[in-house]
Regions:
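Short, solvent-exposed coil/turn segments at beta-strand boundaries
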Residues: 41-47, 65-74, 94-99, 149, ...
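N-terminal leader/targeting segments and the immediate start of mature chains
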Residues: 7-52
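Extended beta-strand-rich segments in extracellular/periplasmic secretory proteins, especially
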Residues: 125-181
């Protein structure tokens, strides 16, 4: 019993193995989930989803809020100028019976051509992360973290055809994928995204609503 206790106490929370075990297990709860309403099985009190994609000189933000199972999920698509941050376009939508219903479908398809969140198609788990090439691993203790939590940042070079299609690049070309999460935190809060030349090109965050 003493040996087991000592071994557990010696777990290195900053190691790749520990962080991939943690993040892989958590992310696999969500990635993939084709029907957004199924996320209520994981987060019964509700959840929010945010996504950002760089399009030329603009950033396209998609935000969805889900607070009660069985009711339409509501969201917005906004295009902002990346330099001035001024809003250029805004479209509201609902997610009902497994489908997006847009205020202006034609304009929505221009702003959000993939018409889906990453988590609806992308598969992420411990095994996938373990096989990828790790480029960076940063662990920040809560005393030094602006969120007040123990946080971690993992960056990989990995082939993800789903992401490549959204970015409009060759599917065989690796992308720089990053994962930002919290260690020993209440509730699900994860961010994933891609970078090119140290600039974020695609980003998504899922946050569990806690009561």
């Amino acid at each position: 019993m003493l040996c087991v206790t000592l071994l557990v106490g010696c777990v290195d929370h900053t190691s790749r193995g520990y962080l991939e075990e943690l993040s892989g297990k958590e992310l696999s709860r969500v990635y993939p989930t084709e029907n957004i309403e199924d996320l209520f099985e994981q987060f019964p009190n509700g959840f929010t989803v945010s996504q950002m994609r760089v399009v030329g000189d603009s950033n396209v933000f998609v935000y969805l809020e889900a607070r009660e199972k069985g009711k339409p999920l509501v969201g917005t698509i906004k295009q902002l100028n990346s330099k001035t941050k001024e809003e250029e376009k805004s479209i509201t939508f609902q997610y009902v019976d497994g489908k997006f219903v847009f205020e202006n479908e034609e304009e929505a398809k221009k702003l959000w051509p993939q018409g889906k969140f990453l988590f609806q198609e992308l598969q992420l788990n411990k095994d996938i992360l373990a096989k990828a090439k790790l480029r960076e691993n940063i662990y920040t203790k809560k005393e030094e973290s602006p969120t007040g939590d123990n946080t971690f940042y993992l960056k990989y070079s990995i082939q993800l055809p789903v992401v490549s299609r959204i970015l409009g690049i060759d599917e065989s070309q690796p992308v720089e994928l990053f994962i930002f999460g919290r260690d020993e935190s209440d509730g699900f809060v994860y961010e994933i995204g891609t970078e090119q030349d140290n600039q974020t090109t695609l980003w998504e965050m899922i946050r569990e609503i806690r009561k």
